[in-house]
């Protein structure tokens, strides 16, 4: 059993262990036996659940008579009356005068009983994790899972930080803390000027995925606009055309099966793509033009075709014929006619006219005078290999190949098949080959399901399906990698109450502090003149000099405390860490309101700011500086509850009589614990300059 482990009875009463006390210091019953578990009585009232009290009372009766008790159901006598009757028959009391061996005081009228209590699987160990700077996935983002898994900042946390106007915190969270940043940390440890943050790899990959799906991305300052990707734009991106893959299945379009060397002219050709980790774009030349699958709806609306009619047209005249039809349209004249129709059309007809007009306006905004030049393509962009890697599995006997590589291969094979079909001079065969090529490109772009079967019972997904997710947006690249960023320098643990902490403090496991403050300790030691290797060894050994640096860091570098879901800005605040033992977080109960926190196993995340600008923002986001909520001026986010209200009430009551004098506050507390004075006894503390 550890502090933070979760306990529950059979009636919904649950909570975490906040303190573990030795038997010789634990409250004792009337038989001088230490009590196993102490519960607050507030839980019974708040849950309106007397069943747990009845069980505990009857448990004492069962213990005395030596046999189980069956509580009758659906009788005139209720359970409380039944329990009282049995207790009276067997001479069992529900309340006892318990003894505190520490103070020597007897405490009367305390409910004591026998209850079935079990420890839940969700424990301190399962909730605990602490991460410094290490371990990244293929997208260069901090890896998740395990004791060192990264914790994320999602859209709700970003909104909370925006509400705080914590711009520097957001800046580092979305750049250096959410991506492998070796150059930054190397400079930081040596106290050198930090290099400017780069565009994160996941952002570049996201843009590349859009372009890979046939969508052009135009950036003008802070504005981004999307439109059709043309052959000219693809040529500008590309370092050259890849070879058409052979229809002979023994020849790979990726790597050699025997030695894993990249195939010449293939998807990992060193000259065209830069090799297995290359950063060069390339492209595939199609046998003949096709309709860009992303803009099929635009094409069929401009040509007044149904989906079936467009599909048939793709098979008969192909992209070349459809381009001619599109280029015959006078976009300006058509736009004028459509605007006139918006005045008379209604319902679905009006909806169709408006969509058609929007497509025309979009073309003109992107500089197209001919629709065919925008929507018909004959070059397929191939994103750099670093964004579609082939990596060896951890077992070493298999290759993990990015889905997109299979789909590129399928496009190449479909293009080769169309070329071969033309040699047959059979219209039906050629039509089927054209449709197959269109479907292959659609699978690659992600507008339809892949024609290639998945591996290991997993579907292969194209670009758009990868971006948006299948089934739920939460599974997509946009949500998992762009809107939510895993972070370095994070921790997570179960929250337990600790009223000894200051309102701006949080008790953090010492092991977690050594992990999350590792880089700051290294910087401090190197600044004191220690060599980097020696400094690293000192941190690992927790040398006194390293501990001194850690203690200095936590005095001015607070941690961000976050309890998900972040419904408002008070769900993410800052607090100064206080080292504690164990693997649970200690929280001042006054923090509960803003964090939507209770103590039934709730876990909280911690994030450490890096740059001084972010540290200064964190210092201004402590609870003492965020006293008031967002609703109105009297909406306190720091408000006493339960025992704190009782304490505040008793603090206003002062007994009449002589003032008791003590040298220190600790001495007065010892006298209270011995029972020499009461909470309402007036005292004079010498160290407080005679304050009463």
Go through each PLM region and give its residues:
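Conserved core architecture of multi-subunit DNA-directed RNA polymerases
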Residues: 8-9, 13-14, 33-38, 47, ...
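Short beta-strand-centered aromatic/proline hotspots
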Residues: 16-20
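P-loop NTPase nucleotide-binding/switch module
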Residues: 1
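Gly/Ser-enriched beta-turn/beta-hairpin loop segments
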Residues: 29-31
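Short, conserved beta-turn/loop elements at beta-strand boundaries and strand-helix junctions
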Residues: 21-26
